[in-house]
A protein has these predicted regions:
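Surface-exposed loop/turn motifs in large extracellular/passenger domains
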Residues: 1-82, 86-110, 114-131, 135-195, ...
Length: 236
């Protein structure tokens, strides 16, 4: 089925809230889960708040895509203690399509967007920023283009989880690739690392990183430049 989320109130104060801390096996999922290859959701406006008082240990998660579910965001705000938007690494053949054209995706402790699943994610607008990083990809394809702004605060902690982002370094984009080949195409947008790394790579699988455009906060992205690339470096 298809679902559209929007705040149609005059005050624009509608909010979906995580009312409990993370608890294994009982309160441990996303506030909204898009499950199945025929399931899709578009978020046009509104606010999803999954931040607990101690987010490093108590989360929570915002929107989850599983088993090939698709998510489109054209506006609104998702703020989470852990991942604002995330997939699940168990899904190797079911391809999820995620499109972010506007809005805000925020993590107060970790990475804002976590991509361990198969499929393609395109961020062409909006703001994506996390205390640890903007996007962590373990498998699949990530396209960054348009007016997208992806920022790593470099101050967060990914924790010591046995999977997920556990133990990973902070970066605007972390191409960890622990579950398969990860391809990142940066055609535009802006990447900022307020501290630590702009782009980091894993070693389990060899990632593919192509930079043909965009604006970067340090010159480390230049090593991924392709022929005829047009990039800007604005030091911070």
């Amino acid at each position: 089925g298809k679902m559209t989320l929007k705040d149609s109130s005059t005050e624009k104060k509608g909010k979906i809230v995580a009312s409990q801390d993370y608890t294994a096996a009982s309160y441990n999922g996303s506030l909204i889960e898009i499950a199945g290859e025929d399931a899709s959701m578009t978020m046009e406006s509104g606010n999803i708040s999954a931040v607990r008082k101690t987010p490093n240990s108590n989360g929570q998660y915002g929107v989850g895509v599983t088993d090939g579910g698709d998510f489109t965001m054209t506006g609104g705000k998702i703020e989470a203690g852990w991942f604002a938007v995330a997939g699940n690494g168990n899904y190797k053949t079911q391809n999820s399509i995620i499109n972010i054209t506007d809005g805000e995706l925020i993590s107060t402790a970790d990475y804002a967007v976590y991509l361990p699943q198969s499929g393609t994610t395109t961020i062409s607008g909006g703001k994506v920023y996390g205390a640890a990083g903007g996007v962590c990809i373990q498998r699949g394809t990530l396209n960054v283009e348009g007016t997208a702004l992806i920022t790593s605060k470099g101050t967060g902690s990914t924790g010591n989880w046995g999977d997920g982002t556990g133990g990973l370094d902070c970066a605007a984009i972390n191409v960890s690739g622990a579950y398969g080949i990860a391809t990142v195409n940066i055609k535009g947008g802006t990447l900022i690392a307020e501290a630590k790394s702009l782009i980091t790579e894993g070693t389990t699988y060899t990632p593919v990183i192509n930079v043909t455009g965009g604006t970067f906060s340090d010159p480390s992205a230049l090593k991924y430049m392709k022929t005829n690339a047009n990039v800007n470096i604005k030091l911070t």
